[in-house]
């Protein structure tokens, strides 16, 4: 096992990365190794997808499957080894079908890629794990060095984050052939074990630029189906009655669940990155979408254990449900998996609803505590002139984009302290689950404009980018000249690709934490600092002083 893709990875003087029987996320060595094998098969599939496009062959089944299966290897998504192997077998079957299509056009069709003809050696998981050793990401570290390995992983993990967003968009009916062609090209190239530093750096920026387009179509999918989010108050306390909790990012799953629970007497609560769903008109119209439950994903083993109903996980993040003994009432959807937990193959939630009706639910309603969400792209753009006016009258000094992932590391309290230290004449724009560090606190307003503005899920960084570009255009300056600072927390691969997206768009002087990614060496961090001004957090006092004086 070698995995260094998330923020909580093991860090020792001998090197970074989880390399024992189990990773810090709870992923076993078996599952981790089989995910490496799956990625290798997906690189071979992409190699043939690139070749097929040369013949004008575009297979939508291949295009939809490839990023979805890649998504299953993202942190805290799928821990079920047999399902990982199932994805690998499906990848090979699709590859062979695509290969046959190419050969039907050109009998001499060939692909020069080491993954292009990969076959699984056995049905036995142990044998497959041994085969997976050929594809461990750091297998040639001694030959290429830590810097090249780090750049490879930056590209691989960034592309994985983009693949997740591609799947979210595809679920909503969004498909862009150019994006998929670019994805396959990059994925196939990474399967050749590239070792050119400049080419890898260029690839990382290409991934960022591609992901901006992915976030654009995801935004179109979400707003096209569920309307543009508008500011909405959400109760974060319990309401009496039977209940279901839904977590993850998939708004379509939430919509289907709301439709199927309507009139059943079962209330629905959002958790984690589902919180922004309350801002969408077509979702909040369901009166039994009663509120948001819990806090950051890392607290789920305590909070889910206390929830008196079933739980549905639609994407990341799931962690071991046996710890809180709720494994009999947690359900996985789509690419999510945990051994022994019931999985929903389709969009029928009747079994979950039946379980909710058999459980006690909340016995009484608590005193409501309301927070505000729903500052989507349209709302943010509508406030652009107000922001400019406040700045011109010196009522608004600075905007801090304070967002990203949450996690268990104690150093993450920095983000709570930072938020509470932001001066009263400054505004906090937040997104993603890092907001749970401070989103239940009171921040007041500036002439009626809330000082805490919740822009949505991690992918809604797109809305923040569009706002920044709009403000810069109106003020006749560059984005980096705005009174705007980005202070980002990271945990997994979606955060990595958001960072690459920002860097590829030329955004500079981003501050990140709580730690630097374990796969980025001091040399690589120095390059990113020199090129983009990217740096790690220090202390709240020092960072605040530096950012306000910039």
UniProtKB/Swiss-Prot annotation:
It catalyses: A + NH4(+) + H2O = hydroxylamine + AH2 + H(+). One of its GO terms (molecular function) is hydroxylamine reductase activity. [2Fe-2S] cluster binds at residues 3, 6, 18, 25. Its cofactor is [2Fe-2S] cluster; hybrid [4Fe-2O-2S] cluster. It comes from the Bacteria. GO terms for biological process: response to hydrogen peroxide. Pfam families: Prismane. Hybrid [4Fe-2O-2S] cluster binds at residues 249, 273, 317, 405, 433, 458, 492, 494. One of its GO terms (cellular component) is cytoplasm. It is found in: Cytoplasm. Binds 1 [2Fe-2S] cluster. Keywords: 2Fe-2S, Cytoplasm, Iron, Iron-sulfur, Metal-binding, Oxidoreductase. Gene3D superfamilies: 1.20.1270.20, 3.40.50.2030. The modification Cysteine persulfide is found at residue 405. Its EC number is 1.7.99.1. It is an enzyme of class 1 (oxidoreductase). InterPro entries: HCP/CODH, Hydroxylam_reduct, Prismane-like_a/b-sand, Prismane-like_sf, Prismane_a-bundle. Catalyzes the reduction of hydroxylamine to form NH(3) and H(2)O. Belongs to the HCP family. This is Hydroxylamine reductase. It comes from Escherichia coli O6:H1 (strain CFT073 / ATCC 700928 / UPEC).
